[in-house]
Amino acid sequence: METKNLTIGERIRYRRKNLKHTQRSLAKALKISHVSVSQWERGDSEPTGKNLFALSKVLQCSPTWILFGDEDKQPTPPVEKPVALSPKELELLELFNALPESEQDTQLAEMRARVKNFNKLFEELLKARQRTNKR
């Protein structure tokens, strides 16, 4: 894909998806809010300074590629890294696997609904903030 003509936000989204990151997982790796990643991808703001360098490290590309899409700085194909789970994630997985399958399905459905509600809430808060900032 030709990335030179993409915006900074489009390059961030393109590379994030190539590496199979969600906005939340990228934000977690950068120790920032997922709203910041969303704003970058929409073009509402741009990463600067330390965030730009951290972003280039997580996205396995150069900062100049993020900013300008330079062909000679094209990112290399994604490298599959083994996933290391935190103690909390391991505990969650062990508890989940101890449940009967029907209860696993119920718990997954409930968690999906909670995440959906939180995402909706964050979007509403972001819209309210944008309306306030426009005044």
Curated annotation (Swiss-Prot):
This is HTH-type transcriptional regulator DicA. This protein is a repressor of division inhibition gene dicB. One of its GO terms (molecular function) is DNA binding. The keyword DNA-binding applies. The keyword DNA-binding applies. Keywords: Cell cycle, Cell division, DNA-binding, Repressor, Transcription, Transcription regulation. It comes from the Bacteria. Gene3D superfamilies: lambda repressor-like DNA-binding domains. One of its GO terms (biological process) is cell division. Residues 12-66 form the HTH cro/C1-type domain. Residues 23-42 bind DNA. SUPFAM superfamilies: lambda repressor-like DNA-binding domains. PROSITE patterns: HTH_CROC1.
